[in-house]
Amino acid sequence: MAEMSFLSSEVLGGDFVSPFDQLGLGAEESLGLLDDNLEVAKHFKHHGFSCDKAKAGSSEWLAVDWLVSDNSKEDAFSGTDWMVEKMDLKEFDFDILFSKDDLETMPDELLATLDDTCDLFQPLVQETNKEPPQIVNPIGHLPEGLPTIDQGAPFTFFQPLPPSPGTLSSTPDHSFSLELCSEVVIPEGDSKPDSTTTGFPQCIKEEDAPSDNDSGICMSPDSSLGSPQDSPSTSRGSPNKSLLSPGALSGSSRPKPYDPPGEKMVAAKVKGEKLDKKLKKMEQNKTAATRYRQKKRAEQEALTGECKELEKKNEALKEKADSLAKEIQYLKDQIEEVRKAREKKRVL
């Protein structure tokens, strides 16, 4: 039981400590990159100083805070201003960094090497400040909604190294030259179609990485194709992207065009003819209805006139019938009186 509890405590301790160990290893690796590549420590060592003092001095005046700063959030070029500046070593207080004995023995060659390290990257900055080769952007200005390049991921930290032709020739291969995509506007005749088709997929591929939308910076096709790391990615992405021509992209997004004027005129004429037919039919129906009403009224008036005449005739005939009935009754009475009179005469 004691052994099981001891093993479980070790496992739990390892679980709790492991994430902090990983963070510590990442921090040590990031600091180790700076300390290993700084060649200033070697100059200190040649002139009789210890490695600890050289590292202390280099870490004091080359602090990690101003190398790894938040300039990437503001602008892509704001972090490279320190490469152009010349550092005046008189402003630094070397009494704090080194003892007086060390300062007295410090030769002038050390100061010269420090000045050289400050001016090391000046030719590289001049090359980046030159106008990049102008290439036609086949899709025009990219929309702001698309993500641009992550400013922290593709850049490599410039490290002060001793000026040598080997290092100066090798650094442009690993560093990227930048260009503003929104400012590249030249006529189509000046650029070759091959360069545009191969450069366009790389620009789109680099923009897939999430970053700030304010900078609007994409990688230049010449620099991306020149580096050995990005050449296979461009060769893979170019066939798929080159198939999409600018006309196809614009045609898919645009709505269908309006009908030509000839079809409009024909449609208007057909509609006008239909309306005219309907209006004519309506007028004919109205006239037929009015005529029918007029006929009915005339017929009714005629019938009413005849009815009145017949009623008058009927009344006249009734009067005649009454008069005739009275005459018949009078005649019957007369006949009865005559018959009675004859019977009396016979009796007598």
From Swiss-Prot:
Per the record, residues carrying Phosphoserine are S211, S215, S220, S227, S231, S242, S245
Q: Provide ranges: composition bias, Polar residues.
A: 221-241
Function, as annotated, reads: Transcription factor that binds the cAMP response element (CRE) (consensus: 5'-GTGACGT[AC][AG]-3') and displays two biological functions, as regulator of metabolic and redox processes under normal cellular conditions, and as master transcription factor during integrated stress response (ISR). Binds to asymmetric CRE's as a heterodimer and to palindromic CRE's as a homodimer. Core effector of the ISR, which is required for adaptation to various stress such as endoplasmic reticulum (ER) stress, amino acid starvation, mitochondrial stress or oxidative stress.
Q: What's the family?
A: Belongs to the bZIP family.
Residue segments, region Interaction with GABBR1: 302-338
Please give the superkingdom of this protein's source.
Eukaryota
Kindly state the positions of the motif BetaTrCP degron motif in this protein: 211-220
Spell out the residue ranges making up region: Basic motif.
Answer: 277-297
Return the domain comment text from this UniProt entry. Answer: The BetaTrCP degron motif promotes binding to BTRC when phosphorylated.
Q: Where is this cross-link: Glycyl lysine isopeptide (Lys-Gly) (interchain with G-Cter in SUMO2)?
A: K53, K256, K264, K269
Positions bearing 4-hydroxyproline: P232
The UniProt keywords, alphabetically, are: Acetylation, Activator, Biological rhythms, Cell membrane, Cytoplasm, Cytoskeleton, DNA-binding, Hydroxylation, Isopeptide bond, Membrane, Nucleus, Phosphoprotein, Repressor, Transcription, Transcription regulation, Ubl conjugation
* Single biological process term from Gene Ontology: response to endoplasmic reticulum stress
Q: Which gene encodes it?
A: ATF4
What name has this protein been given in UniProt? Cyclic AMP-dependent transcription factor ATF-4
Q: How does it assemble?
A: Binds DNA as a homodimer and as a heterodimer. Heterodimer; heterodimerizes with CEBPB. Heterodimer; heterodimerizes with DDIT3/CHOP. Interacts with CEP290 (via an N-terminal region). Interacts with NEK6, DAPK2 (isoform 2) and ZIPK/DAPK3. Interacts (via its leucine zipper domain) with GABBR1 and GABBR2 (via their C-termini). Forms a heterodimer with TXLNG in osteoblasts. Interacts (via its DNA binding domain) with FOXO1 (C-terminal half); the interaction occurs in osteoblasts and regulates glucose homeostasis through suppression of beta-cell proliferation and a decrease in insulin production.
